[in-house]
């Protein structure tokens, strides 16, 4: 299937510590392919396929970062560590309620939300979703159905990586 390699290939040119080979040796190809097809189909059925962008542009001033796929405190801190690269933008965060307090007084995030209803009234130029999981895409669709979006992990799913390095390299590649 076209694009399936995105599920286990780093989306930038730099090597970072990862367990891709171990993952590929142990994974079920059928399950991985099924998950990829399911996510692609979900994005298409939600009308989001044509809204995916591959760059954060100058006109993307107000951005909503949706961070729900890995709700553990450590994963959230590592995945969002690259936010400093967006200090010239107005960034709001929608995250799990148990992580909201971590970012309440953050100097990058203008507002921090844990409820979808609190975000719906705002206008954003772009959504950054943590991954293309059905949960993240559904939240993006509920909050801003017609706005462009991109993914930090996107379709990348499975291999363990150094999350801090991944976050910085990925966000840098989107700028």
Where in the sequence are the language-model features?
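Catalytic machinery of carbohydrate-active enzymes
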Residues: 1-175
């Amino acid at each position: 299937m076209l694009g399936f390699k995105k599920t286990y290939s780093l989306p930038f040119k730099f090597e970072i510590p990862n367990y891709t080979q171990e993952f590929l040796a142990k994974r079920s190809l059928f399950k991985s392919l099924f998950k990829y097809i399911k996510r692609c189909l979900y994005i298409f059925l939600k009308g989001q396929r044509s809204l995916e962008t591959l760059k954060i542009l100058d006109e993307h001033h107000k951005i909503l970062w949706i961070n729900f796929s890995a709700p553990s405190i450590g994963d959230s801190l590592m995945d969002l560590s690259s936010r400093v690269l967006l200090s010239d933008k107005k960034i709001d965060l929608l995250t799990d309620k148990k992580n909201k307090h971590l970012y309440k007084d953050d100097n990058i995030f203008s507002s921090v939300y844990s409820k979808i209803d609190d975000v719906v009234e705002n206008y954003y130029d772009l959504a950054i979703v943590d991954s293309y999981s059905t949960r993240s895409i559904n939240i993006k669709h509920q909050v801003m159905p017609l706005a462009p979006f991109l993914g930090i992990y996107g379709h990348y799913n499975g291999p363990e990586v150094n999350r801090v390095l991944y976050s910085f390299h990925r966000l840098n590649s989107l700028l």
